Amino acid sequence: MSRIDRALVSLDWEEHFENTSQRMLPHVILDHCPLLLEASVVRRGQSAFKFENMWLQAEGFVDRVQQWWIGYSFTGSPSYILAQKLKALNADLKKWNREVFSDLAFRKKNLLTKLMGLDAREESVGLSNEDQHRRIQLKGDIEHLASLEEISWRQKSRALFVKEGDNNTRFFHRLVNSRRNANLILYEDEANVRSQLVLFYQGLYEENEVWRPTMDGLDFACIEEKERLSLEKEFSKEEVFQVLKEMEGDKAPSPNGFTMAFFHKCCSIVEKDVMDFFDYFHRHSVFERSLNASFLTLIPKKCNAVNIKDFCSISLVGSVYKVLANRLRAVLDNLISESQNSFVGGRQILDSVLIANECLDSRLKSILSGVVCKLDIEKAYDHVNWEALFYLLGRMGFGSKWRGWIRVCVTSVRFSVLVNGSPEGFFGNSRGLRQGDPLSQLLFLLIMEVLSRLLKKTEECNLIRGFQVGSVNSVGVRISHMLFADDTILFVMLLEISFCP
């Protein structure tokens, strides 16, 4: 059903009224619906700490961080020490920002007022050499603050496609407002909605199935010995910090609040503690639970989302998963069948689209009957059974150390739900993978490989027969299914059923 009733606002309106919502009221007589345009202040809870990338441009910032970092003294495992140092730095940065860096907009407005005063004096009585020098300095300070403002708005806007130096603060500001309005959750009873969100995700991530089918009758590919050794080798400084450099500095921070830009700039300061953490994790397969905390960010899957199921949850996680994901991606090609092309190195998801289109074309040109069925698995990542995953890793030949790493990464997660920018709740889970985690999307490919192998086994037993691509009179290629992450397309011919002996 198309919408013909809309309320249009100007860009100036959007800048003055950031939290604007539109509601359609019931229509009684006319075909058109009355529209209610509400411009109100949204009640937001206390936001979590977020590192501001503009702080990195402050004079002497790195030296200041180094002094703080050296002064921290904690005892415990390397992961605990790293977590506590980041927490202490969090507090020092907030205090420094409040007392020294201060409010950027206020500072800029104050400088502009002084500059306007000098301009007015120049028109009336003229400026002395000292005043002219002061005006040049004021202009430089204002330009510097404008640059910091641009960095801040770019970070908030998530406009990663805009390169450094594209000085368009107004553009970034509008993007931030647009994101806030699109991701905003309006509610009548704040406490009730927050508690219901937490209860929903606690139930979603709780394993309540008492029985799951086994995979004993399916054949899986196995990794080679050299691949197993490559997965479990020690973490080098070059490997870890290359991953950090490749991660976008403006991307959303993890629950500790620090962006990748902080680690890029302060690499030499945190290097030892980060590598101690990775070395300890390599030897003992454990790390501090607080480093594995995750925010669930609710992203609307459609316009006018009103039900909680209309939102998909995306997790914001740390860089350790990126290191493991890079290693796992290197061995996936031999483990994943050709029916899956997403997230596998050397394969293109467009190939699956072309193959699916060829299957449809071949069926339309023939006189044979068939069925095309698209399966969309609801909350697929969230329903993954852990024991099935660990069993599958063993069947595919992964070593005990690697399986231990995956186990601790998957099972030690703690979640908080972000509601209008404010975290709510703190709970664990007993099933599921985190959508948005670079490692989880690869582990999910292995899970979906079970479905692919099951469909292949079904075809071998003549329970189904795929579409033949190519000439009907030639041998051609038979395609029974294509998998696109958590979406599956089946291509099945109509035939008489015969069962496996």
Predicted regions, residues:
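Nucleotidyl polymerases of mobile genetic elements and RNA viruses
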Residues: R3, L8-V9, H27-I29, L37, ...
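Metal-dependent phosphoesterases centered on the DNase I-like endonuclease/exonuclease/phosphatase
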Residues: M1-E15, F49
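Short Pro/Gly-enriched beta-strand edge/turn motifs at strand-loop
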Residues: F17-T20, F278
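Non-catalytic, usually N-terminal nucleic-acid engagement modules in DNA/RNA processing proteins
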Residues: H32
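Short, P/G- and charge-enriched loop/turn segments at secondary-structure junctions
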Residues: Q22-L25
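Short helix-loop capping/hinge motifs at secondary-structure junctions, enriched
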Residues: E14-E18, V42-G45
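Arg/Lys-enriched, amphipathic patches
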Residues: L35-Y187, E207, R212, R228-K233, ...
